[in-house]
C-alpha cells in the first residue's frame, strides 16, 4: 500500500487555515445543521447515480462568492481552498500519471471533491492525454 499523503501532510493543511475562518465555518455549520446533512445526502445521491454534472454543481458551490458572505478573511480562505483542492489535485494527478506511466496496476482513491470539478484529478489526467472514465455506484457514465 502506498499513500498519496500522510497524516502530517493533512494535519499541516488543516491547521494552516486562519483561525477566524475555522470559527466562521464551524459557526455556519452549527447554525444550519440540516443544510449540512442535506448537502451530504445530495453528494452521495449524485455519486450513486454517477451524475458528474450534479456532483460538479455541488462541489463548486463552495467557490460561489455568495458562500463567502460573512467570511472574516476571504484571502485566507481562498489560499486555504487552493491548498486544500488545487495544489493537492495537481499532486494527486501527477502521482496517478506516474503509476499509469509505470504500468503499475493500483487501486487509486481520492475523495469526490478531488476527482471532479474544474481542475480536478480527472480533468488533469484527461489534459495529460489519458482516457478518464467516471464510475459511480451504478456503473460507468
State the predicted function of each range.
Residues 1-101, 138:
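Hydrophobic, often amphipathic alpha-helical segments used for membrane interaction and targeting
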